Amino acid sequence: NFGLDYIKSLEKEEKYNFFPSKKGLTNYGERLSLGFSCLALKAFYMTGEWQDLKTIDKEKWVQHINSFQGEDSKFPKNSYLDPVLINSYSNLGYKENIKYILKRLISISPNFNYDSKNVAINKAINAETKQAVSTLHEVGYKNNKEINKVYSIGHDISYYLNTLDWSKPWSSGAQFASMCVFSETQGLNLKSELQSFIKTISDKETGSYFKEYPKSNREVINGAMKVISGLDWLETEIHHPKKLIDFCLNNKPIL
């Protein structure tokens, strides 16, 4: 299996840590660990390699992923925290910080809705946590510490989901999907709320999920894929599957 062999070749000296590629790595990309370890584990599982590992190796890999679970007052309790990811936001260069400041000023206008740096890093941590939890559950393991608070800014889940920019469903759909994962793996019992919300933004014409039509058809499709991954966790059917299939077939990928 060429793909699996390539992934194995990316493993670092520290076992269960992987490079994202062999060349062209950034300073942070070279040192990030959690996300790439999860992706490699998924690749092992999908190719059947995981089943052939010794139990001790499986448990050590799971322990490695769970070692990132910690407490930091800036993030929901028991989130999965990769220090390198956090530092990449904390130590942004002058130009990047200026961009966030300008975007925040522009967002004063109702016509724009850019994420602040704080919101951006919280979304990143949420995505990392979702990926770790879903990966572990997929292979029959679970997180050590229960995650009973999700990034919902102190309100109920419907309120939080409505604060997201659903003209950008790829990003917002990812947040929705993470809530689905947490609901079903952490016993949060959010299923009915999540089902009710997503039904309200299902689009009968495209089969996708958004409030305001996205700027590109690729965003329509990619957003739908994110939402569908969440619906799968909820064991909920896609609302307009035929429309979505037709839309995808009529919008060929840009090569």
Predicted regions and their residues:
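An alpha-helical repeat/solenoid feature that recognizes helix-turn-helix modules
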Residues: 28-52, 77-144, 163-192, 213-240, ...
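A generic structured-segment signal
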Residues: 8, 12, 20, 30, ...
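Preference for long, well-ordered alpha-helical segments
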Residues: 154-160, 164
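Non-catalytic carbohydrate-binding regions of carbohydrate-active enzymes
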Residues: 245-255
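Low-complexity, Ser/Thr/Pro/Gly-enriched N-terminal "stalk/linker" regions
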Residues: 1-37, 46, 56-62, 73-75
